[in-house]
Curated annotation (Swiss-Prot):
Region annotation Disordered: where it falls in the sequence: 109-168
Effect in UniProt of substituting S128P: In strain: TN106
Extent of Low complexity compositional bias: 146-158
GO cellular component: nucleoid
Role, per record: Plays an important role in DNA replication, recombination and repair. Binds to ssDNA and to an array of partner proteins to recruit them to their sites of action during DNA metabolism.
InterPro entries associated with the record: NA-bd_OB-fold (IPR012340), Primosome_PriB/ssb (IPR000424), ssDNA-bd (IPR011344)
Organism listed in the record: Haemophilus influenzae (strain ATCC 51907 / DSM 11121 / KW20 / Rd)
Motif (Important for interaction with partner proteins): 163-168
Subunit text: Homotetramer.
HAMAP family membership: SSB (MF_00984)
Domain SSB residues, every copy: 4-109
Name assigned to this protein: Single-stranded DNA-binding protein
C-alpha cells in the first residue's frame, strides 16, 4: 500500500516571496509561512502561543503568481508535500533540508491584505481569491479566478392569508 505525503497550511507570509530563475528559465519562489497555535497553561493559567515557520517552494507559473501577488503579511492556503533536499556546504559536508513543495496555493483575505496591507477581514468570503494548482509532473497548470457573485434581489412572496398566531 502506498503512503500519503500531504501537507495543508493556512498562515501568513513572514517576508515577501524570494523569486529566482533556474538556468532553464523556470521560476522558483520560496515563501516562509507562519502558523500559530495557542492554549492556556494548566499550571499558571497563562495564555501561551507557539509559532511554527514553514518553508514552501513553488515552481513555474505558481512561482510567478507568488512573486506578483503575495507580500509579507498575506494570508495563504497551501496544499503540498514534504520533500527533503540534500546539498553540500562550502566544507564539502552533506546538508539536508525538509520543505514543502507547493501543489495548490490560494490567496485568502481581502485585496488590501494580499497587497501587503492590513485589510479588514471579517471572516466572510474572501474579497480577492486566486487559486493555482500544479499536477504531480509539474507540466500542467490549472488556475482560476472566481467571478464575484452577488445575489439578485428577490421579491418576497405576498403574505396573504398568513396566520401569525403561535399554536401554543
Amino acid at each position: 500500500m502506498a503512503g500519503i505525503n500531504k501537507v495543508i497550511i493556512v498562515g501568513h507570509l513572514g517576508n515577501d516571496p524570494e523569486i529566482r530563475t533556474m538556468p532553464n528559465g523556470d521560476a522558483v519562489a520560496n515563501i516562509s509561512v507562519a502558523t500559530s497555535e495557542s492554549w492556556n497553561d494548566r499550571n499558571t493559567g497563562e495564555r501561551r502561543e507557539v509559532t511554527e515557520w514553514h518553508r514552501i517552494v513553488f515552481y513555474r507559473r505558481q512561482a510567478e503568481i507568488c512573486g506578483e501577488y503575495l507580500r509579507k503579511g498575506s494570508q495563504v492556503y497551501v496544499e503540498g508535500r514534504l520533500k527533503t533536499r540534500k546539498w553540500q556546504d562550502q566544507n564539502g559536508q552533506d546538508r539536508y533540508t525538509t520543505e514543502i513543495q507547493g501543489d495548490v496555493m490560494q490567496m485568502l483575505g481581502g485585496r488590501n491584505q494580499n497587497a501587503g496591507g492590513y485589510g479588514n477581514d471579517m471572516g466572510g468570503a474572501p474579497q480577492s481569491s486566486y487559486q493555482a494548482r500544479q499536477t504531480n509532473n509539474g507540466n500542467s497548470y490549472q488556475s482560476s479566478r472566481p467571478a464575484p457573485q452577488q445575489a439578485a434581489p428577490q421579491a418576497e412572496p405576498p403574505m396573504d392569508g398568513f396566520d401569525d398566531d403561535i399554536p401554543f
